[in-house]
């Protein structure tokens, strides 16, 4: 989804190295040192404007979080939320989901979130979907044995595609929600898009899948 370009976004990121990891390839294998503790590390690929990642970090101070996005303007909005919250357990980085193995060592990440990823509905764009096999190959490397992906979307076609992709890869579908907001799931933290879509009456789908 295209986002309006934000003036000064790049400089905003560069001026806040406490929260934005500008050269993540240089800290590969040393993320615990970045956070200054040995707490588990969870990442969100496609973190958008940061509502989810900051919400999770506030609820779970015993876990470290990294929000990852490929769009400079979007990540700059996430940085605003991080600066407002002053949370010590959240970092941000500008990166593509297909390159994560360059920034994280094998098994360095404990859990991975995918929230409202671009569905790339056209067949010729299938390889761009964040639940395509090549992405799963990458996620498997940086997650531990039996590591988990928590995936959430409002797009039924992408959800069904992702369930099939996970299953064909040999992953276990631990829990599946066909209408998250109508369920008794208590630990949900909404993204900006999730609130917008749910207010329009759209169903939200969620799955927890394990390698």
UniProtKB/Swiss-Prot annotation:
Protein name stated in the entry: tRNA (guanine-N(7)-)-methyltransferase
Protein role: Catalyzes the formation of N(7)-methylguanine at position 46 (m7G46) in tRNA.
Annotated pathway: tRNA modification; N(7)-methylguanine-tRNA biosynthesis
Name of the encoding gene: trmB
GO terms assigned for molecular function: tRNA (guanine(46)-N7)-methyltransferase activity
Transferase found in the keyword field: yes
Reactions performed catalytically: guanosine(46) in tRNA + S-adenosyl-L-methionine = N(7)-methylguanosine(46) in tRNA + S-adenosyl-L-homocysteine
Sequence positions that bind S-adenosyl-L-methionine: 44, 69, 96, 118
Native species: Streptococcus mutans serotype c (strain ATCC 700610 / UA159)
Record key words, sorted: Methyltransferase, S-adenosyl-L-methionine, Transferase, tRNA processing
Cellular component per GO, a single term: tRNA methyltransferase complex
Residues forming the catalytic site: 118
Lineage: Bacteria, Bacillati, Bacillota, Bacilli, Lactobacillales
Transmembrane segments annotated in the record for this chain: none
Location of region: Interaction with RNA: 124-129
CDD domains xref list: AdoMet_MTases
